[in-house]
Amino acid sequence: MTLDIQADVSLKPFNSFGVEVKAKWFAQAHSDDEVREALAYCATHQLPLLVIGGGSNLLLTADIQALVLRMATRGIRLLSDDGQRVVVEAEAGETWHPFVQWTLEQGLSGLENLSLIPGTVGAAPMQNIGAYGVEIKDVFAGLTALDRQTGELREFDLAQCQFAYRDSLFKHQAGRWLILRVRFALNRVDHLHLEYGPVRQRLSEQGIEQPTASDVSRAICSIRSEKLPDPAVLGNAGSFFKNPVVPAALAAQIKQSHPGLVGYPQADGQVKLAAGWLIEQAGWKGFREADAGVHRLQSLVLVNYGGASGLQLLELARRIQRDIAERFSVELEMEPNLY
């Protein structure tokens, strides 16, 4: 066995909230073989397996009585290039933002709007991560996953992944599928998505009239850096709540009493509301109790000022959910996975 399995390991360095909990067993997988070793170890010792990547979408509320396997696989490959469309494959353990930067350095567009999102490549399809008008599903070309029940590899295409807003098949069947590598369809000719006003405004402020994909990436990085705290400095998991999608009638009702409501009409006739706006209107922006709080600049972000437990952060989140439900009749859904 080459897999190094350690006992009673602190997970504080492995979750972006910086919550102090321990894993009963912990290992890092650098290859497919080591992933299989972890599965075999769990089967032999009748242990559950929790697979993590960058730990940026986790809220850990108690010690983990399982083998925690951190995906540390590395590798990026060009699979095909017809001069316009390029298919790139990346291992699940690759850190997301450096991977995005690598694609831009190769002259490839498609991922620039997803710049500076924390986490790993393997976690990106699970959440169908998205930002500034682009989601993983828009650039997805396939993935390879390991069936934890049979040990067999399976290829998934776009339809099989069942992508939806911050959702996928893998989020609902995390106990079965373990994503090993992901493929992306990118372009040698820029097809930029500049629908969001703040991005266009930032480019205009920089005097850029004909932006490249790299220009868009830099603009988005500067916007995100201003709005979102660095987890290395202040523990957080990025946006904590999904933007709720509600019936148009409810959105209109809220707008009557709150004319400044921020909402985006959807193709199905519903309206996607800005969760951060709702939370700010309810007075939670900058709230702090002990070391658990809401960020002073971005109401969507819950923060750990140093000593908050996962349970304290969870209780704060639930208080916010209850308040928003009472004020606006809107149910907020948490983005991070709870353990």
Swiss-Prot record:
Pfam families: FAD_binding_4 (PF01565), MurB_C (PF02873). It is an enzyme of class 1 (oxidoreductase). Pathway: Cell wall biogenesis; peptidoglycan biosynthesis. Its EC number is 1.3.1.98. GO terms for biological process: cell division; cell wall organization; peptidoglycan biosynthetic process; regulation of cell shape. Signal peptide: none annotated. The keyword Repressor does not apply. Its cofactor is FAD. The active site is at R166, S239, E335. It is found in: Cytoplasm. GO terms for molecular function: FAD binding; UDP-N-acetylmuramate dehydrogenase activity. Transmembrane segments: none annotated. Keywords: Cell cycle, Cell division, Cell shape, Cell wall biogenesis/degradation, Cytoplasm, FAD, Flavoprotein, NADP, Oxidoreductase, Peptidoglycan synthesis. It catalyses: UDP-N-acetyl-alpha-D-muramate + NADP(+) = UDP-N-acetyl-3-O-(1-carboxyvinyl)-alpha-D-glucosamine + NADPH + H(+). Residues 18-189 form the FAD-binding PCMH-type domain. One of its GO terms (cellular component) is cytosol. The keyword Cell cycle applies. Belongs to the MurB family. Cell wall formation. This is UDP-N-acetylenolpyruvoylglucosamine reductase. The gene is murB.
